[in-house]
Amino acid sequence: MSNVDHAEIAKFEALAHRWWDRESEFKPLHDINPLRVNWIDERVNLAGKKVLDVGCGGGILSEAMAQRGATVMGIDMGEAPLAVAQLHQLESGVSVEYRQITAEALAEEMPEQFDVVTCLEMLEHVPDPSSVIRACFRMVKPGGQVFFSTINRNPKAYLFAIIGAEYIMKLLPRGTHDFKKFIRPSELGAWSRQAGLTVKDIIGLTYNPLTKHYKLASDVDVNYMIQTLREE
C-alpha cells in the first residue's frame, strides 16, 4: 500500500500556482526558510554535498540549498507543485533535479546515495510517518545526516498552528493541518532511533504575531526541527 494521502496532495495541488508568491498562503514557508537553511548549513556545510529534499513541494528549500552549493534532488508526489518547482528554476537559474516519487520507492532505487536528507513540514501529511523516516535512513550514506521538521501535538500547538494560523491570523488556508497528525518530539525521536538514526539536536521555531517575525528558539511546543545522524 502506498504511503500517500491523496487528500493531502490535493490541498497543495490546488494552491501550487501561488507557491513562489511571498504574500500568498506560502508566506510562512518563505519567512522560515532562511532560518531553516542556515541551521542545516551550520551543521553539515551544504557546499559540495549531495542532498535529497523529501516532500519538496514547489522547491523553496531545494533551491535555497542548491544556492549554498549543494547538488539537490527534490521529490514530491504532487504533480502541480513539481511543475511549479521546475518552472521556477528556469526563472531563478538554480539547478535542482525534481522527481515525482515516494521516499519509499526512491529508497529501493537509491540506497545510501545522499550526504544529507531533509524532510521538512512533510511527515504530518502522510499516513505513516515512520515509513518515511525509515526510507530517509536507507537513502542517507553512513555518516550522513537527516533533518526533520514538523509540529508538536499538544493544546498550545492546536491553539497556535490551527486556531491562530488558520483561523485568526489567516497565515494558512483553513484545513491545512490535521491536529491528529501532529507529532510529538518524543514520537519523532523514537521513530528515528527505531530506523537506526541518532538524534543529535532539536530546535524550536517561534512566531511573534506583533512583529510578524519567526526565530529559532529552545521552545519546541509548536514548530520544531531535529538533526539526526546515521552512524558510520
Swiss-Prot record:
Its EC number is 2.1.1.222, 2.1.1.64. Keywords: Methyltransferase, S-adenosyl-L-methionine, Transferase, Ubiquinone biosynthesis. It comes from the Bacteria. InterPro entries: SAM-dependent_MTases_sf, UbiG_MeTrfase. S-adenosyl-L-methionine binds at residues 36, 55, 76, 120. The keyword Methyltransferase applies. It holds the Pfam family Methyltransf_23. It catalyses: a 3-demethylubiquinol + S-adenosyl-L-methionine = a ubiquinol + S-adenosyl-L-homocysteine + H(+); a 3-(all-trans-polyprenyl)benzene-1,2-diol + S-adenosyl-L-methionine = a 2-methoxy-6-(all-trans-polyprenyl)phenol + S-adenosyl-L-homocysteine + H(+). One of its GO terms (molecular function) is 2-polyprenyl-6-hydroxyphenol methylase activity. CDD domains: AdoMet_MTases (cd02440). Belongs to the methyltransferase superfamily. UbiG/COQ3 family. HAMAP family: UbiG. This is Ubiquinone biosynthesis O-methyltransferase. It comes from Pseudomonas fluorescens (strain SBW25).
